[in-house]
Amino acid sequence: MKIIIATHNPHKTEEIKNFFKGYPVEIYSMADLGIKEDIEETGDTIEENALIKARFLKEKVDGIVIADDTGLFVEHLNGQPGVYSARFAGENATYEDNNKKLLKLLEGVPYEKRKAYFKTVIAVVEREKETLLEGKLEGHILDHPRGKNGFGYDPVFYVDNLGKSLAELTMEEKNKISHRADALMKLKNYILKRLEEK
């Protein structure tokens, strides 16, 4: 079975290849197939963005196409930054810029009102079928960054049942509980089911 990932990110490709090690699945990135175009994410939701990327690539290739998008949703901010998570503080914002903006908006807000969740959506597009798979991780936003690992909003996202921020976890610990791991596990189950049908 051939799976093509709608990404230019080598880390994402590697991560998914590792997930399917030992299975009769060939995984390719856009770079592997010489597709250099950037896909504009113009959707109003992360679901729409994942589908936009997958549909764009499906028009160019055979096989199963997958694409993902992730957002951080803060209850007190009516679900912001959401679909704008990567560019919350502006078009070329750094992770630090985004975290600073988020903490500023939540200044003085008590801990119990700082509930948030990460959500990753994986769109799977086949010839006749589109499927959305979702992974979620719930927690709270801290009032200052903690930890040196990870990236993005990890230093300000507190995982209550572990008593640590995502940036205080090792990669192995994070990969066991993350929204991304949750979505990838659902993808794996989906693909294994498809393999059984063949």
Curated annotation (Swiss-Prot):
Substrate binds at T7, H8, N9, P10, H11, K12, T70, F151, G152, Y153, D154, K174, H179, R180. Keywords: Hydrolase, Magnesium, Metal-binding, Nucleotide metabolism, Nucleotide-binding. It catalyses: XTP + H2O = XMP + diphosphate + H(+); dITP + H2O = dIMP + diphosphate + H(+); ITP + H2O = IMP + diphosphate + H(+). Mg(2+) binds at E40, D69. Binds 1 Mg(2+) ion per subunit. GO terms for biological process: nucleotide metabolic process; purine nucleoside triphosphate catabolic process. Its cofactor is Mg(2+). Disulfide bonds: none annotated. The active site is at D69 (proton acceptor). GO terms for cellular component: cytosol. GO terms for molecular function: dITP diphosphatase activity; ITP diphosphatase activity; metal ion binding; nucleotide binding; ribonucleoside triphosphate phosphatase activity; XTP diphosphatase activity. Signal peptide: none annotated. Its EC number is 3.6.1.66. CDD domains: HAM1 (cd00515). Homodimer. Belongs to the HAM1 NTPase family. Pyrophosphatase that catalyzes the hydrolysis of nucleoside triphosphates to their monophosphate derivatives, with a high preference for the non-canonical purine nucleotides XTP (xanthosine triphosphate), dITP (deoxyinosine triphosphate) and ITP. Seems to function as a house-cleaning enzyme that removes non-canonical purine nucleotides from the nucleotide pool, thus preventing their incorporation into DNA/RNA and avoiding chromosomal lesions. HAMAP family: Non_canon_purine_NTPase (MF_01405). This is dITP/XTP pyrophosphatase. It comes from Thermoanaerobacter sp. (strain X514). The lineage of its organism: Bacteria, Bacillati, Bacillota, Clostridia, Thermoanaerobacterales.
